[in-house]
Every structure is written in C-alpha cells, then in structure tokens.
Amino acid sequence: VAAPVSPVVDARPSAPAPVPQPITVSRFAAGQALNVRRHLDALRDFRRDEFGDSIARPTAGHIHAVNSLLGQLRTPLDRAVHVLEQAAGSPSTDAMASRAETLLTAKSRAHDWVRATEKVWDFYFELFGQRQSAFGVWLVSCDRIALDCYQHVFMHLGQPRSIPSPPPFAYMRTGFSPATYRRGIPLRKLGRQSNPFPLVQLPYHRLVNPWTMGAILHEVSHNLQNELDLQSEVPAAIVHRLGSAGAPREAQLIWARWNREIFGDMLGLLLGGEAFVASLLDVIGRAPEQVLDYSPRGVHPTPYLRAKLSFHLLSSMGFDDVAQHYAAVWHRLYPNTSTHTMPAQLFDTAERAIPLVVEAVVGTKFVGLGRKSLREVIFFEPRHQVMIEEAAQRLASGIDPGVIPERFLIGAVRVAVDRGLAEPETLMRNFYLELSRR
C-alpha cells in the first residue's frame, strides 16, 4: 500500500487582505467629475464612414446638420462638466455641507445635460444605423423620390428662394402610419430640440408594397407647404374663396382646419398623377362608419369628402374619364350616406364647396410660390401618364425605364401591379433596383 502523500504547505506569509478605502467627499466628487467628462467625450460627432460605404449611408449634409445640433447641446454640457470639475477639485473646508450641496447641484445639472444630449445622439445613431440594414436601399430610394419632388418644385417657382438643405430623410418605423416631421420644429423625441431636416416616416408594410407609396408624395408635400411659407396663405385662401361664394361660416372654418391634409393631397396628385388617387383610396377606403365619420377636432377631411377633392382635381388635370370612373366606384362603395356625422352646414354644401376648395389651393397665386399658382409650378398632364405606362412595361421586363423622374416610378409600379404585368415581388425588386442605381 502506498504511503499517503503529505500536503504541500506554502511557507510564504499570506498577503494581507486589502483594506477598504473610506469613501470621502473628495473621492466621490472626483468619480462624478470623471464620469460626466467621459460621458461628454463619448457624445462625439458622427462620421459618415461609420455608417458604411454604400449608397444608402447618410449624406454629408445630413451628418453635418446633426453634428451642428450636437455641438449646440455640447456647449452647455461642457460648461456643466467644467463647473462639476471645479467643485470636485476645490479644497476641503470646514463648510463641508455647503461644498457637498454645490457638488451635488453641479452633478445633477451635468447629468441632466448628458441625458438631453444622449437622447438626441441615440435618436440619430439609430436613424442613421437603419441605412446599414437590409432596408437601406429601400430608404435611400425614398430619399431620391423626395429629392425629385423638392427639385421640381424649386425649379419652377416664380421667384428664387433660398435652397433648403439638407433634403428629406426617410426612415422605417413598423406598426405606424406614414408621417413626417418638418424642418425646424421642436421634437419630443429630441428633447424639444429643433429638427434639422425633414424626416419621412414610412411603415414596413408600405415599403414592401411600393405601389402604395403615394404616401411619400403626400408627406413631402407637408414639408413643402412650410418650406414655401404657405402654412398661413393656404387656409386664408380657402376661407376667402368659400366666403366670397357665400358658404356658411362653419363650413369655411372646417375646410380651413383641414388645409394641411388637403394641400398634401392636392400637391401629391400634381406630383404623381392618377396613381396617387389609387394609393389614397387604398388608405381611406374603409368601413362606411369610418368613411362617413366627422371628427370635430380632426385635421384630416372626412374620408368621404376627401376622396372627392382628388376626383375633382384629377378631372381638371385632363383625366375626366378616369376621375368619373373613380367617382362611380366610390359611390358604389358608399351608396348610403344617411349615417354620416358631419355638420349639416358642411355636408349640405360640400358639392358646391369642393370645386372652390380645390381652386383655392391649386389656383391661387401665392407669395410663397413667387406669385404663381400651384398648378403653374407643378403640373401633371396626360402625356406624363403615357411616360408612366411605358415605364411600367419596362419595370415589368427588368429594363432600364430611362430618364423618367423618380417620383413617376411610383405610378409606373402601380400600373404594372394593377395590370398584372409581372409578379409583385419582381416589380418591387425592380422598383428599388432602378431607384438605387440613379
């Protein structure tokens, strides 16, 4: 039997246990100053190359605009950090309570600015980060449609205006309707800081079905109304036109309250043509109780009337047969209007008011347009629809559609899917392929 092995005993003296260092105000202060200084340093400017090298990455203009906003926020943050560092480095005195209060106040202010700045930094980090995802090409395609709309409008104004920069930026948000956030408005998601460029929010279900993307034209039109200083001129024109025709005062004010959504539809139709109407009906064609329901504080026209505005404008653009067809379908879908909840002064005068409202929006010569009317700045004629239909055939065949404007590709893919020229998946792929290579 083997002898038991004796354990090896380490004859070296054991190391003394670490002695906890007492927490002092000075150590606490130094730690807080270090933390917020590192927070400040981490909230640095963005670089364009950190979002990849594809065509989908943010433009230099978008990066610069966000960095300028971050720079504005870092100035008070830097001051707050400096105050905290001074408080942390001040010598101990007998008035410890006073020193602690000064320190804690400085710490709280610095952290408030850290949170405010980081909220903005995080928002744009996630926004720009979408461009590195599988949806990057889709989003930059939407950017190019929006840019085409802006360029076309600003090229045809009656007088020169300062060029807006940077252009709109599209991003995806699932589970929501299309929306937009205008340049220069305070945003809650930015801590009430001003938005440096227009944002166009698009849901996934629209992006995957680009023939429903008339929403881009509508949302971009909201931005253009403000970029062109028409936010007051348009409702005033509506009230004036209706008042001159003897419309009831209540009806005048309701139509004026709806001016932004009406303008978005009218300009969207002038930009995109008849496919815009089809896309609009996709959205507002719902159950009768929804289509006929009036919202006393709503900014959207009651859907039943909203569709008729577009039918009237489409007819005046030279598409009378198409407009009559849409109107006939609309009336077959909603033959009974007896359950509507609209005020009598609005509903009973609507048929007379609709042409007046449309003319007020597209026919008034606005100062913001260089004393031109909207239909003089933007127009869509039957010849443009011929271009769209030719482009639809090319998209379906995977052929380069040529020099057609980006915004017309929405109509082209709509025609192609409605006529079954190719499988929807093929049309979606070709739509984004064409826009992404421009």
Feature map (PLM): residue ranges:
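Hydrophobic (often cysteine-bearing) scaffold residues that line and stabilize catalytic clefts
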Residues: 142, 213, 260
